[in-house]
C-alpha cells in the first residue's frame, strides 16, 4: 500500500512561497507584436523565384519590422521550421531602426540565448532570445541583425516580406548601417529566420491575428511603407493597446499546401500559439478556388463548397478549443485577375460561382463570432465581380495601398475585441 507522509511546515513554506522574481513575472506577460509566418524555401522549378541565396556563408542578415504595440522589453523569435540540420547563430542584435539599413546607435542591444551570445538552432525548431531591456513605443520599427558564422542552407523564409533585407559578408550585427554598394552585399524582400517579435505587457493584453493569403500578406502593397491592410489595422488598434499580427502567406490555401503549409496545418503555430491572441480574422479561399488547373497546380481538382466549409469548421474547432474568437471575412472580387501573365486563367466563371457560394455561407451560416464583408466593401458597385478601380492594384486581384487602407478602416473595431478593456497606448522613452 502506498503511504503518504506530511511535509514539514518549513518545507511547505519554501515550496509555496513566491520569490521576488516570480512576483514581478506575475505582473507581466509576453505579447506577440509582430510576426511573419515561416515557409519552406522552394526550388528553382517553382513558378516564382525564391529570391534568396541557397546557402549563407558567414553572412549577416539585417531586417526591419514594424511592431504593432510597444513595451518596456522585447524578445526575438527565430524560426528553423524547415531546416534539416542544426543552424549556428554566431551573434544577434536588435535596435530601433533609422533610415534604410541604419540603426539608432544608442538603442543597440546584444541578443542572448539562455545567457549566451551564440546558439544552435535545432532542425524544425524555433529559437527564442532572452528578454532585452529596450523600451519601444507603439508602431516602432526595429532592426534585427543575425550573423551565421558557418555555411547555412536557407531552408526557412517568409517569401513576401514587403521590406528590404540586407545580406552582408562577415559579422555586421553591430554595424551602424550596411552599404548596399559594398562588395558582397545583397538585398532581398524575403525574410530569413525572423518570425516574431514579442513585447512585455500587462496580464490580459490581447492580440488580433490575421490568417490569410497574399491579400493579407500585402502582395501589391508599397515596399517598405507598412501598407498592408493588417498594418493599417494595427495603426487603428495601437491607441487601445491591442496588437495585430499578420499570419498571411502569399499563395496560402485553406485545404492544400501551396507557397506554405495549408492553413489547417499551420494554424496552431502561426496563430493559436502566439502569445496574447484572443481573436483571429480568417480571409482565405481564393487560392483554393483558383489555383487548380493553373500553372500553380495544373493537376489539382478544385475543392467543393462542402470541402471548404469542412475546412473552415476545423479552424473554428481548433480556435474555440483555445478560447479564441473567429471572425470570418468574405473573399474579395477577382474578375479579370492577373491579365497578361501565365496565370491569366486564374479567374473563370465557374470559379466565380464557387466564390459567391462560399461568401454566402460565410455571411449567413452563423458559424463565426462576427463577419467582415470585405467583398461588399472592396467591389465596384458598377461591376460587382471586380475590385473598385480606386482600390485595385492593377492586377484585378490584390488591393493596392488605398484598397488596403479601406479594408482596415471599414472594420468596426469592437468586433475584434474580446470583451476586455484594452490598455492605453505605450509611449517609450529611450534611456
Show the residue positions of the predicted features.
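Conserved SGNH/GDSL esterase-like catalytic core that processes O-acyl groups on lipids
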Residues: 34, 57-63, 78, 86, ...
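N-terminal secretory targeting modules
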Residues: 2, 10, 23-211, 221-223, ...
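Catalytic His-Asp segment of secreted/periplasmic serine-dependent ester chemistry enzymes
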Residues: 264, 290, 332-431
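Bacterial N-terminal signal peptides
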Residues: 8-17
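Residues that form or immediately flank small-molecule/cofactor binding pockets and catalytic motifs
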Residues: 202, 249, 376-379
Amino acid at each position: 500500500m502506498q503511504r503518504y507522509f506530511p511535509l514539514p511546515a518549513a518545507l511547505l513554506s519554501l515550496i509555496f512561497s513566491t520569490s521576488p522574481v516570480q512576483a514581478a513575472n506575475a505582473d507581466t506577460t509576453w505579447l506577440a507584436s509582430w510576426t511573419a509566418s515561416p515557409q519552406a524555401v522552394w526550388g528553382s522549378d517553382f513558378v516564382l523565384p525564391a529570391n534568396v541565396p541557397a546557402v549563407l556563408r558567414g553572412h549577416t542578415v539585417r531586417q526591419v519590422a514594424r511592431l504593432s504595440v510597444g513595451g518596456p522589453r522585447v524578445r526575438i523569435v527565430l524560426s528553423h521550421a524547415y531546416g534539416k540540420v542544426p543552424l549556428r547563430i554566431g551573434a544577434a542584435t536588435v535596435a530601433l531602426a533609422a533610415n534604410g539599413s541604419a540603426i539608432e546607435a544608442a538603442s543597440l542591444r546584444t541578443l542572448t540565448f539562455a545567457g549566451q551570445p551564440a546558439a544552435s538552432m535545432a532542425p524544425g525548431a524555433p529559437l527564442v532570445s532572452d528578454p532585452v531591456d529596450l523600451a519601444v513605443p507603439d508602431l516602432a520599427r526595429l532592426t534585427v541583425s543575425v550573423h551565421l558564422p558557418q555555411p547555412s542552407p536557407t531552408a526557412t523564409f517568409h517569401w513576401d516580406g514587403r521590406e528590404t533585407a540586407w545580406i552582408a559578408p562577415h559579422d555586421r550585427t553591430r554595424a551602424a548601417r550596411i552599404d548596399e554598394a559594398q562588395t558582397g552585399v545583397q538585398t532581398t524582400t524575403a525574410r530569413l529566420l525572423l518570425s516574431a517579435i514579442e513585447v512585455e505587457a500587462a496580464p490580459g493584453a490581447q492580440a488580433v491575428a490575421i490568417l490569410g493569403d497574399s491579400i493579407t500578406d500585402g502582395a501589391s502593397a508599397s515596399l517598405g511603407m507598412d501598407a498592408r491592410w493588417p498594418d493599417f489595422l494595427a495603426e487603428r488598434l495601437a491607441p487601445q493597446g491591442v496588437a495585430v499580427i499578420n499570419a498571411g502567406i502569399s499563395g496560402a490555401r485553406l485545404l492544400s499546401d501551396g507557397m506554405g503549409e495549408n492553413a489547417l496545418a499551420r494554424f496552431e503555430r502561426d496563430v493559436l500559439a502566439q502569445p496574447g491572441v484572443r481573436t483571429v480574422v480568417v480571409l482565405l479561399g481564393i487560392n483554393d478556388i483558383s489555383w487548380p488547373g493553373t500553372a500553380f497546380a495544373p493537376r489539382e481538382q478544385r475543392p467543393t463548397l462542402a470541402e471548404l466549409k469542412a475546412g473552415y469548421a476545423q479552424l473554428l474547432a481548433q480556435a474555440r478549443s483555445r478560447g479564441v474568437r473567429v471572425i470570418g471575412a468574405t473573399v474579395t472580387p477577382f474578375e479579370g485577375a492577373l491579365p497578361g501573365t501565365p496565370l491569366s486563367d486564374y479567374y473563370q466563371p465557374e470559379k466565380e460561382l464557387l466564390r459567391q457560394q462560399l461568401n454566402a455561407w460565410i455571411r449567413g451560416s452563423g458559424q463565426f463570432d462576427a463577419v467582415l464583408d470585405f467583398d461588399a466593401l472592396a467591389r465596384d458597385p458598377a461591376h460587382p465581380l471586380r475590385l473598385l478601380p480606386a482600390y485595385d492594384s492593377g492586377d484585378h486581384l490584390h488591393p493596392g495601398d488605398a484598397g488596403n487602407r479601406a479594408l482596415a478602416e471599414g472594420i468596426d473595431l469592437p468586433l475584434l475585441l474580446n470583451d476586455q478593456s484594452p490598455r492605453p497606448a505605450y509611449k517609450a522613452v529611450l534611456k
